Amino acid sequence: RQPGVEVRPLKQMTGSSEFCEVFMTGARVEKDNLIGRLGEGWAIANTTLGYERGGRSLARISGYASQYHHLVGAVRRLKRHGQPLIESPLVRQKLGKIWADLEVERYNALRVLTQLEKGEHPGAGGSLTKLSYSEFEKRFMEMAQEILGPYGQLTDGAPPELALEIDTAVGDQGTWAYAFLWSRAGTIYAGSSEIQKNVIGERILGLPKESRADRAGVAR
């Protein structure tokens, strides 16, 4: 609704449009709508991004845990070659791997929560958490597809007793197929995995900043 700002939704492979491209042409902001001081927009944006990336991480991990229990329930009901999937050593190994990774993510989220309770800002550490949980979500959904096989690709028509419907990361009721496709978005929104690696390298590890057009003469 802001004059000079055009928002164009991007159709995703999930069929929805949570991502958009934004064009600003001669857009001006009233002084009363200015947040902070003039010229401090980037610093303010970085602060809000820190909270976005790390502040809600525990809620995300709780969502992944719920999805995991849905997966275990489906595996108990599904059969392959006449035997419940849960009895397959390979399937049990994969479920154990997911759970172990999930516990790592939970402790990462608790670390951020402890910082917030102390009144501290997540800072660049939020990038560590965001990179970790978004890449985990992708691995989780890939492994879920390996375990469920063709059942994991169904978008409708699955027998209700298979419990394939889950709450996706965006809070919608979906399917394992939808969740698998949506997991790719996690490594893009709130800053892509590549951006998080840059933040971690520059602000946590102290590595040289990469070359940019507005950083003439800075070595890679």
Feature-to-residue mapping (PLM):
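Tryptophan-centric aromatic hotspots in well-structured domains and transmembrane helices
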Residues: 19, 23, 42-44, 107-110, ...
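Helix-rich, typically C-terminal accessory recognition domains appended to large enzymatic cores
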Residues: 143-151
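Structured core elements
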Residues: 6, 21-23, 104, 182, ...
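Extended amphipathic alpha-helical segments enriched in small hydrophobics
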Residues: 56-120, 127-143
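FAD-binding core of flavoproteins
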Residues: 1-76, 80, 202, 206-220
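Active-site lining segments that contact anionic ligands and/or coordinate catalytic metals
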Residues: 19, 39, 68, 123, ...
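Glycine-rich phosphate/cofactor-binding loops in nucleotide/flavin-utilizing enzymes
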Residues: 41-57, 151-220
